[in-house]
From Swiss-Prot:
Site feature: Part of a proton relay during catalysis: 43, 106
Protein name: 4-hydroxy-tetrahydrodipicolinate synthase
Reaction equation(s) it catalyzes: L-aspartate 4-semialdehyde + pyruvate = (2S,4S)-4-hydroxy-2,3,4,5-tetrahydrodipicolinate + H2O + H(+)
Cytoplasm is among the record's keywords: yes
Length: 294
């Protein structure tokens, strides 16, 4: 089962191609910071704009680059169950440590449809499956009762929870018990979720500040709640501003500001708007850097 800090890693582009030089440096940064793993080809990695060839290549190159030093949980979700299975099987052949499977978007299946979709994906996976519930992007909410049913399936071992609803998260944790781990899909709710039984985060902000996110989670797990809380409060403005526009627009801009990649992003997403809010975001990040956060 997955726990700790997993970075929903960006996909850097240069001249509309994946920039592997920058990408490998990002992976090195994550390894050095001590994250538990990275999640390529997720929402933050702009997976909807990757071709099937790019998707497979990016996962393969990630596994090769990290050399087993951290886990690779590959995004293989689709609104077509058949396609999700194909992506999952391909990722498993490339020796990933797990897969991230998002709710089928656009189709708006029933809870039974969601159950059967994830059941089918899990049956074709040779590695643990992390479910991904993000109704704000998929228009469908994977209910705790459905997750409880799914927790009986051998391969389904974790869930990335991005509903923003702590009440639902608490109910989910109480239902699945020790059958599954639950990780936050919202940076600003990582600490609150840990307090009610969550075990980590799939983080966007850890692209830029992986060590800080690792420290916050570890402090809490070690019983150093005050220290964990300090990091949470220091980052609270950055957590909010990192989602001032559709993810990954703000974090992609932030990574470019600090020299980690080009600001390039693929349509239909566009570059971060230049306004008072973006200036505020950059300043908040600079303040965190001045405080010594990495």
């Amino acid at each position: 089962m997955f726990q700790g800090v997993y970075t929903a890693i960006i996909t850097p582009f240069k001249n509309d191609k994946i920039d592997y030089d920058s990408y490998n440096k990002l992976l090195e940064k994550q390894i050095k910071a001590g994250v538990n793993g990275v999640v390529p080809c997720g929402t933050t990695g702009e997976s909807p704009t990757l071709s099937h060839t790019e998707h497979a290549e990016l996962i393969r190159e990630t596994v090769k680059a990290v050399q087993g030093k951290i886990q690779v949980v590959a995004g293989t979700g689709s609104n077509s169950t058949r396609e999700a299975i194909e992506l999952t099987e391909a990722a498993c052949k490339d020796s990933v440590d797990g897969i991230l499977s998002v709710n089928p978007y656009y189709n708006k299946p029933t809870q039974e449809g969601l159950f059967q979709h994830f059941q089918a994906v899990a049956e074709h996976s040779s590695v643990p499956v992390m479910l991904y519930n993000i109704p704000g992007r998929t228009s469908i909410n994977l209910q705790p009762e459905t997750v409880f049913r799914l927790s009986e399936i051998k391969r389904i071992r974790s869930m990335k929870e991005a509903t923003g609803d702590l009440g639902q998260m608490g109910k989910l944790i109480s239902l699945v018990g020790n059958k599954m781990t639950v990780l936050s899909g919202d940076d600003n709710l990582t600490l609150p979720l840990l307090a009610i039984g969550g075990v980590g985060v799939v983080s966007v902000v850890s692209n830029l500040f992986p060590k800080a996110m690792v420290e916050m989670v570890k402090y809490f797990q070690d019983g150093k709640v005050i220290e964990a809380r300090k990091i949470h409060y220091d980052f609270i403005e950055a957590f909010a501003l990192a989602f001032m526009e559709t993810n990954p627009i703000p974090i992609k801009a932030a990574m470019s500001w600090f020299g980690h990649c080009e600001p390039e992003i693929r349509l239909p997403l566009t570059r971060l708007s230049q306004n008072e809010t973006s200036v505020k975001f950059k300043k908040a990040l600079e303040v965190l850097k001045e405080k010594g956060y990495e």
